[in-house]
Amino acid sequence: MHELAIATALAESLIKYSREHNAVISCAHVRCGILSGIDPEALQFAWEPAAANFPGSGLENCRLQINRALLQHRCSSCNKVFEFDSWQIECPECKTETLRRESGNEFVLESIEVENV
């Protein structure tokens, strides 16, 4: 389960930010693409033990909010950007099959919520 390693790396990054800014992080918002190879349920399950590995870090009560990113493509002909949750091989606008993937394989820390200290 590589989600535990990902959750641990995320916790380490949040701790670094927390220490640099003297902040307590209450929630981390991440975007996880459907082609990222990360199972959102497994990542959510791994978050609590990963955060607990750093006692006194302030992450003990930090929530993890996972937003799922669909596949997003741009048509090379008409430049339309569209999302879908299945394999699609043509533009819904002009029916061209020359598509460029814009997103869907990312894992990004989008934002954090910080408590007043």
Where in the sequence are the language-model features?
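Long, charged N-terminal interaction/targeting segments
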Residues: 1-60
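Short loop/turn motifs enriched for small/polar and acidic residues
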Residues: 31-35, 67-71, 112
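Short, flexible, mixed-charge glycine/proline-rich loop motifs
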Residues: 63-70, 80-85
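Short cysteine-rich clusters marking metal-coordination/redox-active sites
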Residues: 74-78, 91-94
